[in-house]
UniProtKB/Swiss-Prot annotation:
Highest levels in heart, liver and kidney. Lower levels in brain and lung. A zinc finger (THAP-type) spans 5-57. It is found in: Nucleus, Nucleoplasm; Nucleus, PML body. Belongs to the THAP1 family. It comes from Mus musculus (Mouse). This is THAP domain-containing protein 1.
Length: 210
């Protein structure tokens, strides 16, 4: 017969590969056996010679150290249990079933005119509704502001491009003016000295009387 734990809710069974030992009720010591029965707290439970409790319900000081936690001390009593009373569990389940689940306020129909009326705004529902509106309004305002900023950036970019083009045109005009001034100065100098500047294929400058 496979040994199993008699504690309520414990599913431990003997397995040679698991470090769990099983200890029979001390039937030959009635006073100690009653302590075990009281600790188990099972209604109408009477231990037999096959009844046992696994080592998981005993504290470490209940075992003899020299026996590698396989033998109990003479007055050891199990104290580690997770009690769940059946009737309490049933009552909890029944109370949970009886509690109505919260539901949002339903729309009402006015019998006199047959129109669907909006749901009654309770304080909680109204608070959530207002918070939602604030969030939507903030988001719309932010999107509108972003669009305005993007439009401003685009306008500034166009203005910058136009200014750069105007600057380049002015630089070209300035270069042309410099060339004209330089040419005019050379022309004036040649006129004052009575020289005529000939093309490059001439190798000398011919002086003419003024």
């Amino acid at each position: 017969m496979v040994q199993s734990c008699s504690a309520y809710g414990c599913k431990n069974r003997y397995d040679k590969d698991k470090p769990v030992s099983f200890h029979k009720f001390p039937l030959t010591r009635p006073s100690l056996c009653k302590q075990w029965e009281a600790a188990v707290k099972r209604k109408n439970f009477k231990p037999t010679k096959y009844s046992s409790i696994c080592s998981e319900h005993f504290t470490p000081d209940c075992f003899k150290r020299e026996c590698n936690n396989k033998l109990l001390k003479e007055n050891a009593v199990p104290t580690i249990f997770l009690y769940i009373e059946p009737h309490e569990k049933k009552e909890d389940l029944e109370s949970q079933e009886q509690l109505p689940s919260p539901s949002p306020p339903a729309s009402q129909v006015d019998a006199a005119i047959g129109l669907l009326m909006p749901p009654l705004q309770t304080p909680d529902n109204l608070s959530v509704f207002c918070d939602h509106n604030y969030t939507v309004e903030d988001t719309m305002h932010q999107r509108k502001r972003i669009l305005q900023l993007e439009q401003q950036v685009e306008k500034l970019r166009k203005k910058l491009k136009t200014a750069q083009q105007r600057c380049r045109r002015q630089e070209r005009q300035l270069e042309k003016l410099k060339e004209v001034v330089h040419f005019q100065r050379e022309k004036d100098d040649a006129s004052e000295r009575g020289y005529v500047i000939l093309p490059n294929d001439y190798f000398e400058i011919v002086e003419v009387p003024a």
